């Protein structure tokens, strides 16, 4: 096995992530471990990390009153600004890529469509509720896509801002990159020849649930989405199974 493949496998299994100097875009990201041996997740209050390492929900007790207010303002502003794209056809007309991935025969699981706007993704507007990098729709067979949230992202190598303190938690993924092209998820834990393992750009999910804690969850908060009527009863009975589309 090549050294490159060994590096990929080692990073994926050892709890290591790649990090940068905040607000800088380095030529070559440094490799740093973010999990201690035996540790399964990062400490509550950690604001940046791999999606698999961050805790699902923020610990609101760690936030100040001002930070909670900032989180509520961001949530309500995003919810209001995104109302125009509740209909997926309107989102498509505005430039979001709403094309669904093909489902395998018999696949009736929840899909989470991240409808990206390529121009918004490249405009360097950060945490702009009027220009979210992606809209998130729940997709379920036999039903129209339902807008359940937005996703903000920052340019590669830039740390996402945290005006809401520990409530704002920016996640990232390990990807294989070739030159300046977009990174792709490693296939079977390996990067193809000519590409290198690095950490993708940071992202922040914001879910349109009715409570602050679940609204800032790293992954789709299925229980709360069900509670608030954003997923169908059938999908809720099926549990947390779902995938991005």
Predicted regions and their residues:
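Bacterial N-terminal signal peptides that target proteins for export
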Residues: 1-8
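Bacterial N-terminal signal peptides
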Residues: 8-17
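Boundary at the C-terminal end of the N-terminal hydrophobic targeting segment
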Residues: 19, 24-27
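Primary mode marks residue(s) on the alpha4-beta5-alpha5 output face of response regulator receiver
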Residues: 28-245
């Amino acid at each position: 096995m090549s050294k490159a493949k060994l590096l990929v496998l080692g990073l994926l299994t050892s709890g290591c992530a790649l990090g940068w100097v905040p607000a800088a875009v380095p030529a070559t990201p440094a490799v740093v471990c973010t999990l201690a041996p035996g540790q399964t997740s990062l400490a509550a209050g950690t604001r940046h990390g791999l999606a698999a390492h961050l805790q699902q929900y923020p610990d609101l007790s760690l936030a100040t009153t001002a930070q909670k207010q900032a989180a509520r303002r961001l949530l309500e502003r995003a919810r209001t600004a995104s109302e125009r794209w509740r209909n997926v056809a309107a989102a498509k007309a505005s430039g979001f890529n709403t094309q669904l991935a093909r489902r395998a025969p018999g696949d009736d699981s929840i899909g989470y469509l991240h409808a990206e706007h390529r121009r918004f993704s490249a405009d360097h507007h950060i945490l702009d509720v009027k220009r979210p990098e992606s809209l998130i729709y729940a997709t379920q067979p036999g039903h129209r896509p339902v807008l359940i949230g937005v996703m903000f992202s920052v340019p590669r190598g830039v740390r996402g801002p945290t005006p809401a303190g520990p409530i704002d938690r920016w996640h990232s993924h390990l990807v294989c990159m070739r030159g300046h092209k977009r990174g792709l998820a490693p296939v079977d834990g390996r990067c193809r020849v000519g590409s290198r393992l690095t950490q993708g750009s940071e992202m922040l999910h914001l879910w349109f649930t009715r409570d602050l804690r679940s609204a800032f969850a790293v992954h789709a908060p299925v229980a709360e989405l069900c509670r608030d009527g954003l997923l169908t009863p059938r999908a809720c009975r099926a549990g947390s199974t779902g995938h991005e589309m």
